[in-house]
Amino acid sequence: MVIRRTQTALTLFFGLALFAGSLVLHTGSAAAANNPSVDPSFRYGKNLTDAEQVGADIWFNATAGNARFFTYVYQQRLGVMIDWYRVLQSNARDERFHRWGLINDPDCCKPGDPNCPATSYSETYGFDYCPGDDELLQYVGKTGYRDPACDLKDVPLAQGDPHGPNDQRQSACDLEFGTSTGALGLRKFPNPKFDKVKWLQINGGHLDSWDGYTAKVTPRKDREAPAKSHLIDGSIEPPYRIGMSCGACHIAFDPLNPPKDPIHPKWENLSGTVGNQYGRFAQILGSGMAPNTIEYQIYGHSRPGAVDTSAIPNDQVNNAGTMNALINLAKRPLFEEDVVKWRKTNQCPAGGNERTCWCEPGKDGKCWERSRKKDLVHHILKGGEDSIGALEAIQRVYFNIGSCSEEGWVNHLTDMRQLDPTMRGFGQTPFDIGQVRRDCPQFRAIEDRLDEVLKFLLTGAPADLYQARGLKNNAALIEQLNKEFGKGAVEQGRAVFASKCASCHSSQNAPFEKKDFRTVSTDPKDKGIRIDWLGNDKLIPVSEVATNRSRALHSNHMKGRVWEEYGSESLRAKPGDPQLKEPSDGGRGYYRNISLLSLWAYAPFMHNNAVGPEVCGGSPDDHYHSPYVDTEGKPLASPPPCWVFDPSVEGRFKLYKASMKALLNPSQRIPKVTGFNSEVTIRLFPKLGDGKIERFIDTAILFPVGTPAARIGNFRHKELVGDLVMARVDFDKLTAKYVGRYGPEKGKQIAKTIQDKGTELLAKPGSILEAGAELREVYSNSLAVIENDGHRFGEDLSEEEKDALTAFLATL
């Protein structure tokens, strides 16, 4: 397939959600042949089929319309500002990786550099110049731009597809590729509403300056609202609308062939299956916010390589998770579960209900039927929440980053500042797949090509350390490791793994003592992949693994929540964890046993990258704040330094060894608690119906500097406000609520504490409500604070056995 563009080609792999910075050309095209930066045999990986190639093109480039979300809806509906220029300005291209963890697009250039078609920043409005911009820049402030996705050449429908044999797929134009911003995973589109005259006026007469647009504007004297910038000013339109492909979080450096200079990678140094271990997407999403706002503190504290996937569809659970690598998916375990979902069919009953069967108008036999069946599904996400099928999980990623937001899901989200339970936005409601399919063409454009995307994802393979070191085979690596860790260390480690680890971290069946964990499949269709996924993907109670439990308490897939339709009935039927104080019903309270394939390349460890050294971008990284605390929870005066990003083979291996040491010696870990670096105050003005007079409780919740970030991210402030009102108008109801939850003695005490707080606040308008320990226990979705505890399996091994296990795992 060929997507035509002016100069160059994009060539990468994929991860869990990824994309690339330029458009894609098939091997053998004239443009690829004339492009010196691209090996003509390299296109996302070697030997892809046409279907896999199309899947890669889509997954790398498609934004599916979310540029509109990130330009308008995100700011106006969620009240959170992104300063795209701060993140993407071309004059800071050399700092982009270290500061934001973004990977520079090899095909883009800084205006004014030798051989760059753009000679000045004013030509590109301060951004990099990228392939396709010669056309795109002509449409800034104008309509009529033809998206490069329109040139996508689909492969034929699979034989037997219920929607075949005629091709009735949604137009590929609705995939919306745009062009690269210069950072892989972020795409730009010309803004037809851009007003050049206004832009020059607000930015001092300079097209390449965004200073006036992003600078704080002093509020009117008669208002107490904090100063905000024109980022939220709908009357000023930027030159570009910025979109995000799923790969924004997952394209990164290939462990087998890392770049000599991470600021200047080549295409052959990049992979799409690894996950971006350096990306600071939480900080990017809050880049236009002041540090003392609740929004920034909710968004801005994830480690590099981790992101809270429910930050936008917020469930008030601070639950950052890593951007996973997708490896050997063909051997990932499947589970039979009870699934309600839409399935392809070619007809619906006459006069039927479109809520259970719907045919796309004008498309003969392109229908979908909603039914309940037993299906074999993967457990996807950290707690296995995405559990109705791989295709649906792939598509949900697009919605989670803004596709079909206005048509489909923004009105199902929580408004963090809406305190009236009778108003829209107070809580969540479920995303409706059938309704969004009907109303959003971008949904259909992605859905009609999910089979190709999945085929591409199935190409991901392990990154073997012996290959990364340029050795002949794994035996040569074992020889090296035995020299480093001791004679026979690898074989001894295999025995330790078989007896202590494989019951969770192997997809083969017990007994494990004689199993070969590197056995390659002999089935031709498997293309030489290993039979062992090195994880069983079963769900285990979080109290058993005892790692930070916040991610396991993620609630968006529960009944009545935004992603309800993406969770299986079997998931929601699982019992809660009786060992937890927090609510854990409805499918919450579990982690899955993950894969250990290529573990040497993916340190630090655990779902939040917290076990092992802290990593950072070095001196330009203004987002790093030490999380290390003493036994009393106070910041260490002299914490261990962070390890500067090092994607080299030896850099990864050193980080792996240090992380294994931390993993196997939990008593030696210095506790990590990410704290606020700025005081945060949440203003609350709930209305109180008090007899004939309606009053407002004028108060604020204060979170001082050093407050664990999890406290605010997990704090149910809306329920607190409701209880303050209930304490005034129906104290008996409030008492019954907490007696039922905690028992008579404790429940009555909690109700009395809440009543006293409400009385105090009414007596002293404008006073500060401190979130003390008694309130935190009642209103926290997760009480977990320490981020690097748990997973104590293996701490009783001898030092020799720990070294041996470290050596063996490096061979997998």
Predicted regions and their residues:
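Periplasmic c-type cytochrome electron-transfer domains
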Residues: 2, 7, 21-812
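Hydrophobic helical h-region of N-terminal Sec-dependent signal peptides
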Residues: 12-19
